[in-house]
């Protein structure tokens, strides 16, 4: 109802047509499609690569003498290593994670490893530790940074820019390209997402001895910091990373890579979406095949077909094979267990309802009630027969066998390609249904966010409700009430002016037209505030950015903006416009994914 009211109200005023900002046109990638296709076929990614290496986090600065760590109510001077880790915890006192038992246990265990023997003898209980002064110190320091004089802020900005110029660019095949993340991640406490079993563990400081440098043989090898050396220097032109190291908590690789707005990254983005577009030509055949395989006498073939159905219709990931206990108990399609699935009896006119409940990537809970095809439901019943809750649902299937099957169906096909294809198709179809040409830009942006939300729900891109949500909604509601009062007042003034005009029989004077314009302006402002409130409420538990950046072909959004007169700035911020600069030239208003 609110959207209908907004549409009716917004028809009274129209907005100027969309234009691609001139500053963005100049940044559009000049490489043509044929050139990209040629480079995509080669395993050689570059011939020259030169850079300065990563920028390392500065050494720890000890706490001032007036800031104390207290144990059992008494000040205790810590060694530098133990004090640094204590500050990590102190900075986070205001966060909910520090109240979680897993976080506290992991932190205390890792903290004790950094203590001296004497400190370990004295500090035996986290409950007796008082980090209040440390927490207060960092709050005050943050506030001091916020209130710095303009001259000092400008000086800090210039220092950051100098650092960016020195470490934030590389030379790739004769071209200066921006680097995305040239700084190593600072040490701290691991938080993870969801209820991660390793939350609270110490993220160690990355040292040059941990880092592998990748550059061309004929380039100048970056100098490590004084007194240090690189773990290794190699020249591998089949990869696009500049430096790499292993993050010890999850034993995963971290990379220094090019900025998303760089030409090579743009080419990779384009290739990703072109592979997903190729799926459009064979997806009907693939679906017909896995539906036929639901009836196969071979258990493995039936499990493969049902798994592929889940990947296609529910955007599930395949699920990486990992050793037990290595990471959180996160699962994907192949690693689903019987305990993650519930088959519901017919109820309320609904049949073949399946409930899935498990921890997905980044420990984000996936919980969904979905109506499936009858044969899928029956196959799931067979897969679950005579199994314990902890047994694999797809016991005849492995991640590697599923991935190989996907490659056999189409070169380059992965679960991510399916997710990209279905996400982009969903956005395109939802925009077609929700967008009306006569609507205002405000209503069109609201429609776009609703289409984006449909994709986020499909991909299970959730987030916790922001802690500031209620407060910000109350503030927004007050603004709406104030604006409604202003609209009502302006309506009364306009009606009074109309009455005066009729009594005098005059033509519309300047004052009347001013009141009329004021009312229209206030109504437009009210419409925008109401749309913003609706948008915030509907998206409070949905993360729209992940799909927009990683799974939605930007040409769909740019074409929609051009077709319906929506400024691209309403959909993509400056950084995102730079990242998708390659798409501006390729997306006419008639582009179809």
Curated annotation (Swiss-Prot):
InterPro entries: DNA_brk_join_enz, DNA_topo_DNA_db_N_dom1, DNA_topo_DNA_db_N_dom2, TopoI, TopoI_C_dom, TopoI_cat_a-hlx-sub_euk, TopoI_cat_a/b-sub_euk, TopoI_cat_euk. Residues 261-593 form the Topo IB-type catalytic domain. One of its GO terms (cellular component) is mitochondrial nucleoid. It comes from the Eukaryota. The record marks 145, 193, 241, 272, 330, 361, 403, 461, 479 as: Interaction with DNA. One of its GO terms (biological process) is DNA topological change. Residues 1-43 form a transit peptide. It catalyses: ATP-independent breakage of single-stranded DNA, followed by passage and rejoining. Its EC number is 5.6.2.1. Pfam families: Topo_C_assoc, Topoisom_I, Topoisom_I_N. It is found in: Mitochondrion. Divalent metal ions (calcium or magnesium). Its cofactor is Ca(2+); Mg(2+). It is an enzyme of class 5 (isomerase). One of its GO terms (molecular function) is DNA binding. Keywords: DNA-binding, Isomerase, Mitochondrion, Topoisomerase, Transit peptide. Transmembrane segments: none annotated. Residues 254-255, 317-322, 414-416 are annotated as: Interaction with DNA. The active site is at residue 551. Its main location: mitochondrion. Belongs to the type IB topoisomerase family. Releases the supercoiling and torsional tension of DNA introduced during duplication of mitochondrial DNA by transiently cleaving and rejoining one strand of the DNA duplex. Introduces a single-strand break via transesterification at a target site in duplex DNA. The scissile phosphodiester is attacked by the catalytic tyrosine of the enzyme, resulting in the formation of a DNA-(3'-phosphotyrosyl)-enzyme intermediate and the expulsion of a 5'-OH DNA strand. The free DNA strand then rotates around the intact phosphodiester bond on the opposing strand, thus removing DNA supercoils. This is DNA topoisomerase I, mitochondrial. The lineage of its organism: Eukaryota, Metazoa, Chordata, Craniata, Vertebrata. The gene is Top1mt.
